Amino acid sequence: MPRSQKNDNFIDKTFTVVADILLKVLPTTRNEKEAFVYYRDGMSAQAEGEYAEALQNYAQAMRLEVDPYDRSFIFYNIGLIHTSNGEHTKALEYYYQALDRNPSLPQALNNIAVIYHYRGEQALAAGNIPDSETLFEKAAEYWKEAIRLAPLNYSEAQNWLQTTGR
């Protein structure tokens, strides 16, 4: 039974019902519909912390999805899973792939900045000031772009940029 048919969460159920209706009425191919089902099931598994299952669903969605914009969200969600698992290098790879397909994805830019900021903090704690400054500058660069795309979001990043003079 697909995960989307097992949801106990009201919001997930509502989303599933609305998505199923849209899939029936919108002119989409069979592969597009199937890709969306895998993507939706991946999001559901990811929300429940079932990362291995989510990655399997995203892999299937990726196999079927051809639209670069839609693929960007699959890459982004895979990046989120790797971030949650502390696999920052892998996460960055997926965030960059998401941005290659959708340069206007501020949440990917934000997450890249968060990883660089974290690495900058680690370098600073280790006494490596030159590396920390380089990493903080990279974080600032990505946060500025995320804020440019979504000026009402990322208030903590805006505060950090302001207080550090970046």
UniProtKB/Swiss-Prot annotation:
Membrane topology: Peripheral membrane protein
Gene3D superfamilies named among the record's database cross-references: Tetratricopeptide repeat domain
InterPro entries: PSI_Ycf3_assembly, TPR-like_helical_dom_sf, TPR_rpt
Subcellular location: Plastid, Chloroplast thylakoid membrane
SUPFAM superfamilies membership: TPR-like (SSF48452)
GO cellular component, one term: chloroplast thylakoid membrane
Pfam families: TPR_1
TPR repeats: 35-68, 72-105, 120-153
First-listed, main subcellular location of the protein, grouped into a coarse class: plastid
Entry keyword set: Chloroplast, Membrane, Photosynthesis, Plastid, Repeat, Thylakoid, TPR repeat
Family annotation (NCBIfam families): PRK02603.1
Similarity comment: Belongs to the Ycf3 family.
General function of this protein: Essential for the assembly of the photosystem I (PSI) complex. May act as a chaperone-like factor to guide the assembly of the PSI subunits.
Stated name of the protein: Photosystem I assembly protein Ycf3
Organism name: Ostreococcus tauri
